[in-house]
Amino acid sequence: SCIQVSQTIKIIQKLNEDGQKHTIFYPIYSKTEIMKDPSKKDTGLFFFKGNDNAPFAIFNEGGGFMYVGAMHDSFPHALELSQRGYNAFVLIYRVSHPYVDLARAISFIYDHASLLKVDKNHYSLWGGSAGARMAATLGNKKVLVSYVGNDIPQSDAVIMQYTGYNHISLYDAPTYACVGSDDYIVDAADMKKR
C-alpha cells in the first residue's frame, strides 16, 4: 500500500471540481438506518462521473478487512475509468460488514440509476486484496441473489488484483485476476488454480 503524492493531489482536485458541479458522495443507508446503527454513518459511494447512461464499475479497496485503503487502492482506478467514459463508484465500506455494504451499494445504484444516469443493467465489480474477495463473492450469481434478490442482474465482469481468493463456481461472473510473482500478500500459484 503506497500513496503516490502527485496522483493523490490529482484525485483530490478532481473530486473538488466535480463536487462543485454534482454530488460526489452518496450515503447508501437512510438517516433512519443510521440512527438505529451509527456504524453505517460514513458508509457510501464516491462517484466519478463518466458518460451519461454508460455502464458502471464499483471499486472495493483493500485493507485486509482492517482498514479501507480507498485513496491508494480504488480512487486511481476509478478516476482512470471515468476518464474513459465509464461511471465509477468507490465503495467506502464497514470492515465489519463489507459484503452487506457491497450488496447495498449495488442495490442503491440499481435503484437510483435514473438519477445517477448510469446503465443499471451493465456493471463490473473491481477490487484489490480484501476488496477483490468482495468483488468475487458478490460477482457470484447465487451469492448476489441471497443478498439482493432476483431483480438485479449479475455483474458483467469481476476484476481482481492481488488476492488469494481461489474459489471457482459455475455461477461466477467472467473474471480477470492478476497477481505478481513477487507478491508478498498472495502466492501466485493460488491464482493459477482459479
Language model segments and positions:
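Glycine-rich His-Gly loop
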Residues: 60-64, 163, 180-181
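Serine-hydrolase catalytic-loop signature spanning alpha/beta hydrolases and amidase-signature enzymes
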Residues: 64-67, 88, 108
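Short beta-strand/loop motif that positions the catalytic acidic residue
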Residues: 171, 176-179, 183
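Short beta-strand element of the alpha/beta-hydrolase
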Residues: 54-63, 176
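Primarily recognizes the serine-hydrolase "nucleophile elbow" in alpha/beta-hydrolase
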Residues: 100, 104-172
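Short alpha-helix in the alpha/beta-hydrolase fold that links the catalytic acid
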Residues: 173, 187-194
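Short amphipathic alpha-helix adjacent to the substrate-entry channel of hydrolases
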Residues: 70-89
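N-terminal cap/lid segment of alpha/beta-hydrolase-fold proteins
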Residues: 1-52, 141
